């Protein structure tokens, strides 16, 4: 039996280590960068060690459980634990945050605060993925918004305050519904609050009340995922934020919404999820086609990639709505896959902007010759995004397709229509991505312009791009690496489902 509080250490270490940044000398930018990167690497190694040596893959139950009475007066517990559903997002968080910190190397203004906020965000995200108490989940969910808001409002483009305000209004509005759902579930049927995930999972509710809870949680997670029509904060936010912040937003923040849908809506409220799943699939299909079509019309490079993120999140929603082993496994794989690909595309868009200082695609052109390394990595990762075989995106989308086809919930004709419409969405993806590559890298505009000498990727930027590319290709060739983490937990969720 392992008694060391691994998860508490992993959750609190980044923020407490980040507080030490404020005691560093004022002119120590380089020292602060290296310190932050070392903290992120150490945290990732610590997490990996704990999972490798203390986590059993074939056990679908919660592992590394920690349960401490935190505030006795409110009967509030510090409950942490992981299972096959949360281990993937936690490792993804560690990996992307470490690379985002390395990507933020050029940030010199208020770098002490910048790196502290990144580490605070790291703690909040791991806390959200490992919380086993509804109120603790809500606190971590909210805590993580503060550093995101400050990162958006202090570093970025000219309209950064507008986009940060829009982000906080949307997410705070969604959080009201989340809090109401948490309190409703916690206080239902007893005088004392029962906020434990395990107790709540075994609780049954009147169907009307369960639907109300489901809608509340769905709105909160739809804002974060984002699900249309609550997605409009995302393009503005990505368009203005610094690219290291965009990596965290696209790589981890959006995945928290999808994780919440599975962890709370699907696991705790199965009857309501069974009723709403056809609507989730309809919304997912509309989202894939709408966001892909809208992306094609975007002049702004980062907004085009942001809409592609919205489109790819549609596959996750369809996988969750399919109520099948294959579909849910595909959704979890897409969460991991898009975490890597989305972060990589925003990083490469940011490094391109650092050189040419242009965001509008119709002003670019001919960049392939002066910056061939960026061109090569951008092209390969765009292919991963449009689901080229051999890349993680292809496997994830294909398995979501199989999930819909093999689902027992829907009639054959319905499944054929869903598959056909999804296929149309997949055809639209290469249109906006290949068009983006053509406008940026081909042609003659910038190559023939005066003073058109640009530095290509340095070792740091190449390291970040290749570090993301390796798992994208690795998962594409051997997806069982991700499935081995989640498959038992998915079976447990769905067996509980059909048993009811």
Swiss-Prot record:
GO terms for molecular function: NADH dehydrogenase (ubiquinone) activity; quinone binding. It catalyses: a plastoquinone + NADH + (n+1) H(+)(in) = a plastoquinol + NAD(+) + n H(+)(out); a plastoquinone + NADPH + (n+1) H(+)(in) = a plastoquinol + NADP(+) + n H(+)(out). InterPro entries: NADH_Q_OxRdtase_chain4, NADH_Q_OxRdtase_chainM/4, NADH_UbQ_OxRdtase, ND/Mrp_TM. Its EC number is 7.1.1.-. The chain crosses the membrane at residues 4-24, 37-57, 87-107, 113-130, 134-154, 167-187, 207-227, 242-262, 272-292, 305-325, 330-350, 364-384, 386-406, 417-437, 463-483. Pfam families: Proton_antipo_M. Its main location: plastid. GO terms for biological process: ATP synthesis coupled electron transport. Belongs to the complex I subunit 4 family. This is NAD(P)H-quinone oxidoreductase chain 4, chloroplastic. It comes from Cucumis sativus (Cucumber). The lineage of its organism: Eukaryota, Viridiplantae, Streptophyta, Embryophyta, Tracheophyta.
């Amino acid at each position: 039996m392992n008694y060391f509080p691994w998860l508490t250490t992993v959750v609190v270490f980044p923020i407490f280590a980040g507080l030490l940044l404020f005691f560093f000398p004022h002119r120590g930018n380089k020292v602060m960068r290296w310190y932050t990167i070392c903290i992120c690497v150490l945290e990732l190694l610590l997490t990996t060690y704990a999972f490798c040596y203390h986590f059993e893959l074939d056990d679908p139950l919660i592992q590394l459980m920690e349960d401490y009475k935190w505030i006795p007066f409110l009967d509030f517990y510090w409950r942490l634990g992981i299972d096959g559903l949360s281990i993937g997002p936690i490792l993804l968080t560690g990996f992307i945050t470490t690379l985002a910190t390395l990507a933020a190397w050029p940030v010199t203004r208020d770098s002490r605060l910048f790196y502290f906020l990144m580490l605070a965000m790291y703690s909040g995200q791991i806390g959200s993925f490992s919380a086993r108490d509804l109120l603790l989940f809500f606190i971590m969910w909210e805590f993580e918004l503060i550093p995101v808001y400050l990162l958006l409002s202090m570093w970025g483009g000219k309209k950064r305050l507008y986009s940060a305000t829009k982000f906080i209004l949307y997410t705070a509005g969604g959080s009201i519904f989340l809090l109401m759902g948490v309190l409703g579930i916690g206080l239902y049927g007893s005088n004392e609050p029962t906020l434990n995930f395990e107790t709540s999972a075994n609780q049954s509710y009147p169907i009307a009340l369960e639907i109300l809870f489901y809608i509340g949680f769905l709105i909160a997670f739809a804002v974060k995922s984002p699900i249309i029509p609550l997605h409009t904060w995302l393009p503005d936010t990505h368009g203005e934020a610094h690219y290291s912040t965009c990596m965290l937003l696209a790589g981890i923040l959006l995945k928290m919404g999808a994780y919440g849908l599975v962890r709370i809506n699907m696991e705790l409220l199965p009857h309501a999820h069974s009723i709403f799943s056809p609507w989730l699939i309809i919304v997912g299909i509309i989202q894939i086609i709408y966001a892909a079509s809208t992306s094609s019309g975007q002049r702004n490079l980062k907004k085009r990639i942001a809409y592609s993120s919205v489109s790819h999140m549609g596959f996750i929603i369809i996988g969750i709505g399919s109520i099948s082993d294959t579909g849910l496994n595909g959704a979890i794989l897409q969460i991991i896959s898009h975490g890597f690909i989305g972060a990589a595309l925003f990083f490469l868009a940011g490094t391109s902007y650092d050189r040419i200082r242009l965001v509008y695609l119709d002003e670019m052109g001919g960049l392939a010759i002066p910056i061939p390394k960026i061109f090569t990595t951008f092209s390969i990762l765009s292919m991963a995004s449009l689901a080229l075989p051999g890349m993680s995106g292809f496997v994830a989308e294909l398995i979501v397709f199989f999930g819909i086809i093999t689902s027992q919930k829907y009639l054959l004709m319905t499944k054929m229509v869903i598959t056909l419409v999804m296929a149309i969405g997949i055809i639209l993806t290469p249109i906006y991505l290949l068009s983006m590559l053509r406008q940026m890298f081909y042609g003659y505009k910038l190559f023939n312009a005066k003073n058109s000498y640009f530095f290509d990727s340095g070792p740091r930027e190449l390291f970040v791009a290749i570090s993301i590319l390796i798992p994208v290709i690795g998962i594409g060739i051997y997806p069982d690496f991700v499935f081995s983490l989640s498959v038992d937990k998915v079976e447990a969720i769905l067996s509980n489902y059909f048993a009811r």
